[in-house]
């Protein structure tokens, strides 16, 4: 199985797999059962911003999700990613719909990682920034139902021609270049990721959510990982 570290923007509470009984932000370490969660006042039809950061000195993974003009939601978890992830990883965004549905639209996405070693050269940095997405992106690996549209947006899950969301869809987008996330001689390994998103739903209960994730470089969508498993995990263990 893939090794996954993720921050989930979970719009549908699946209490049978340990979700709280409300939409939430969660930090997932190798399991869909979140290590830490915070209640999320999800606003359908409004553009939101998610910011995820990690610092290996503090060994803390944090996420802040906000909408313009309203209070933000923060969640954090103390974890040493050196002990969880392989040295080289890929970063991505994943989303699913199930019986209930929503659009999982990404408007922009940026990422910066820095690996500071004792040597002078700081060659192990990576930065990318998408303010819009091209029709045939060379620098993204699209998996499942993920596509880019004519408006320059990334649609992680299926939408019909009129833009309405489809159920039972799973899609992921990964940056093509692997990231050197840690090294034994590194003094500090850190990263920051930011994405803006738009979730719209005709349903009273939108589902299932958008996730920022880090995984082994050869990661693929696990069989049966749709819906509540967020396109990341083969089971709910």
UniProtKB/Swiss-Prot annotation:
Q: Where in the cell is it found?
A: Vacuole, Aleurone grain
Q: How is it modified after translation?
A: The beta and gamma chains are produced by partial proteolytic processing of the lectin alpha chain by an asparaginyl endopeptidase. Mixture of 60% alpha lectin and 40% of its beta and gamma proteolytic fragments.
InterPro entries to which the protein is assigned, alphabetical: ConA-like_dom_sf (IPR013320), Lectin_LegA_CS (IPR000985), Lectin_legB_Mn/Ca_BS (IPR019825), Legume_lectin_dom (IPR001220), Leguminous_Lectin (IPR050258)
Which UniProt keywords are present, listed alphabetically?
Calcium, Lectin, Manganese, Mannose-binding, Metal-binding, Toxin, Vacuole
Similarity remark: Belongs to the leguminous lectin family.
Q: Which GO terms describe its molecular function?
A: carbohydrate binding; D-mannose binding; metal ion binding; toxin activity
Which taxonomic lineage does the organism of this UniProt entry have? Eukaryota, Viridiplantae, Streptophyta, Embryophyta, Tracheophyta
Q: How does this chain assemble?
A: Equilibrium between homodimer and homotetramer. Oligomerization is pH-dependent with homotetramers forming at pH 6.5 and above.
Positions annotated to bind Ca(2+): 10, 12, 14, 19, 208
**Positions annotated to bind Mn(2+):** 8, 10, 19, 24
Pfam families in the record: Lectin_legB
Q: Quick one: a GO cellular component term?
A: vacuole
Query: Anything else the record notes?
Result: Binds one manganese (or another transition metal) ion and one calcium ion. The metal ions are essential for the saccharide-binding and cell-agglutinating activities.
Q: Which residues bind a carbohydrate?
A: 12, 99-100, 228
Q: What does this protein do?
A: D-mannose/D-glucose-binding lectin. Has anti-inflammatory activity in rats. Induces histamine release in mast cells from hamster and rat. Induces lymphocyte proliferation and IFNG production. Shows toxicity against the aquatic snail B.glabrata at concentrations higher than 20 ug/ml.
Protein known as: Lectin alpha chain
Q: What tissues express this gene product?
A: Seed.
- Superkingdom of the source species: Eukaryota
């Amino acid at each position: 199985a893939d090794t996954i570290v993720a921050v989930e923007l979970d719009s549908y509470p699946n209490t049978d797999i340990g979700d709280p009984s409300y939409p939430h932000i969660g930090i997932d370490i190798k399991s869909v059962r979140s290590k830490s969660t915070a209640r999320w006042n999800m606003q359908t039809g409004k553009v939101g911003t998610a910011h995820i950061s990690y610092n290996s000195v503090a060994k803390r993974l944090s996420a802040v999700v906000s909408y313009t003009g309203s209070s933000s939601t923060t969640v954090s978890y103390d974890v040493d990613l050196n002990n969880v992830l392989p040295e080289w990883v890929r970063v991505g965004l994943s989303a699913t719909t199930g019986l209930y549905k929503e659009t999982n639209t990404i408007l922009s996405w940026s990422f910066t990682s820095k690996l500071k070693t004792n040597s002078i050269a700081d060659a192990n940095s990576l930065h990318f920034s998408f303010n819009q997405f091209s029709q045939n992106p060379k620098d993204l690996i699209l998996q499942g139902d993920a596509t880019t549209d004519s408006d320059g947006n990334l649609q992680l899950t299926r939408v019909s021609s009129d833009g309405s969301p489809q159920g039972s869809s799973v899609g992921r987008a990964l940056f093509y270049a692997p990231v050197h996330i840690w090294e034994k001689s590194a003094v500090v390994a850190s990263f920051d990721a930011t994405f803006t998103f738009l979730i719209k739903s005709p349903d009273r209960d939108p589902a299932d959510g958008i996730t920022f994730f880090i995984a082994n470089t050869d990661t693929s969508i696990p069989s049966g990982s749709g819906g509540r498993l967020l396109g990341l995990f083969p089971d709910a263990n």
